């Protein structure tokens, strides 16, 4: 009887969904819609929020940033004070929930080139970056990758 219970526990443990938390422990509650966040940002400089999406890519050098598809948009997400990193590989296409601060920011040519280098872009692609970009940015306090 003890063996049957032990086997059932092992099977049930193997069936649980794997969730990985990075940074601050967050929950999947109160996930905002990106369009409503963008609308709210028109009235304030930044907003604390929780969003979700699908990981497109992560920094292959350190895991210090990720690109996430949220609906029809793509967000570039960095992590608060470089206090944590996400996996450098193996998470593309996975669902992600992230909590932190959304705001508009100017991304310099130097930073864009740095991120392009990290992502393994060609020299020709990097040389085509010549203008600063003003875009929606996100600094995450915590991340859940499912």
Listing of model-derived features with the role each one plays in the protein:
Residues 15-146:
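OB-fold and OB-like single-stranded nucleic-acid-recognition modules
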């Amino acid at each position: 009887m003890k063996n049957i219970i032990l086997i059932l526990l092992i099977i049930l443990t193997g069936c649980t969904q794997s969730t990985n938390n990075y940074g601050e422990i967050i929950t999947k509650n109160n996930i905002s819609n990106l369009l409503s966040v963008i609308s709210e940002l028109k009235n304030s400089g930044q907003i604390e929020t929780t969003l979700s999406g699908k990981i497109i890519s992560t920094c292959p050098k350190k895991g210090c940033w990720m690109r996430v598809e949220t609906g029809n948009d793509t967000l570039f997400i960095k992590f608060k004070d470089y206090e944590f990193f996400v996996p450098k590989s193996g998470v593309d296409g996975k669902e992600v929930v992230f909590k932190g601060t959304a705001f508009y920011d100017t991304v310099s040519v130097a930073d864009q080139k740095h991120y392009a280098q990290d992502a393994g872009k060609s020299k020709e692609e990097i040389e085509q970056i010549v203008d600063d970009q003003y875009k929606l940015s996100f600094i995450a306090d915590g991340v859940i990758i499912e």
